[in-house]
């Protein structure tokens, strides 16, 4: 077995073990199903396509570890389905060492390990790095993640499209608020992914910026049912140099519904 394949299997195994162990001692957890629809840019065909995305998302936390996972199934009209997933585990250095690690609005520092997989094209990336946890007024959470971005080849065919390593910076947050007698939440993430060259040939991926803020309204609560179960709203997606393709910029609004359980 090649060294990189061994590292890949080890990384996936450690993430799976972390999820399994921490889920047994979870202090909190949230599981959601998202359904969204909009005209999304295909940066390779250079045109917008009617796309419906079904997302399964889970987050949980214990004293030492926070986990986050999502799996997307995207249906492109008249073309079929593609799949994509991301998973991250973040380890609190303050909790692990038993010492407060804070400064100003930074309330903790953690180590983070992530894996991204585009299953339909059989590509995988590993993202080790660190996390800054912020204590911002009224925010449910706010984090800044800084990781390396490492393409891992999973087959001899994949080696032909092997990428150089780069890095990613991601700010993720949730801000609940009340307005007009209704309960809302503004949440999402914004990331910068540094460009990278292909190891074979002259092709390259450009620097890209992706922002996906969601504005959600608690529809269940508004209708007199239990709060924090059913949301409706909008997701705005801005993507500069989408998927690393130079000049392929996206700015679109998607309809969004969320079931939380």
Residue ranges and their predicted role:
Residues 151-229, 259-261:
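Outer-membrane beta-barrel transmembrane domain signature
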Residues 25-74:
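Short glycine/proline- and aromatic-enriched beta-strand/turn motifs that initiate or cap beta-hairpins
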Residues 249-261:
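Outer-membrane beta-barrel "beta-signal"
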Residues 25-29, 64-68, 93-110, 135-144, ...:
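Short loop/turn motifs that connect adjacent beta-strands in outer-membrane beta-barrel proteins
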Residues 56, 87, 128-132, 169-173, ...:
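Membrane-embedded beta-strands of outer-membrane beta-barrel proteins
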Residues 35-41, 73-77, 113-119, 148-154, ...:
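Transmembrane beta-strands of outer-membrane beta-barrel pores
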Residues 20-23:
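N-terminal signal peptide c-region/cleavage motif recognized by signal peptidases
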Residues 45-50, 75-83, 116-127, 155-165, ...:
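Solvent-exposed loop/turn segments connecting transmembrane beta-strands
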């Amino acid at each position: 077995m090649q060294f990189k394949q061994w590292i890949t299997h080890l990384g996936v195994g450690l993430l799976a073990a972390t999820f399994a162990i921490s889920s047994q001692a979870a202090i909190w957890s949230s599981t959601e199903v998202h359904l969204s629809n909009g005209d999304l840019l295909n940066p390779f065909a250079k045109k917008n396509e009617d796309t419906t995305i079904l997302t399964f998302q889970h987050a949980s936390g214990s004293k030492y570890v926070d986990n986050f996972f999502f799996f997307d199934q995207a249906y492109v009209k008249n073309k079929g389905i593609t799949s994509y997933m991301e998973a991250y585990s973040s380890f609190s250095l303050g909790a692990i060492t038993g010492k407060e690690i804070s400064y100003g609005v930074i309330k903790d520092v953690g180590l983070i390990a992530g894996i991204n997989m585009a299953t339909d094209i059989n590509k995988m990336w590993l993202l080790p790095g660190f996390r800054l946890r912020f204590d911002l007024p009224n925010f449910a959470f706010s984090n800044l993640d800084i990781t390396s971005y490492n393409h891992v080849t999973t087959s001899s065919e994949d080696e032909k499209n092997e990428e150089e390593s780069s890095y990613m910076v991601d700010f993720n947050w949730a801000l609940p608020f009340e307005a007009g007698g209704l309960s809302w939440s503004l949440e999402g993430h914004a990331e910068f992914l540094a460009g990278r060259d292909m190891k074979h040939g002259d092709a390259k991926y450009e620097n890209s910026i992706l922002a996906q803020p969601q504005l959600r309204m608690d529809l269940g609560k508004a209708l007199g049912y239990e709060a924090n179960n059913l949301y409706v709203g909008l997701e705005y997606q801005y993507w500069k140099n989408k998927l690393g393709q130079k000049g392929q910029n996206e700015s679109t609004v998607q309809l969004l519904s969320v079931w939380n359980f």
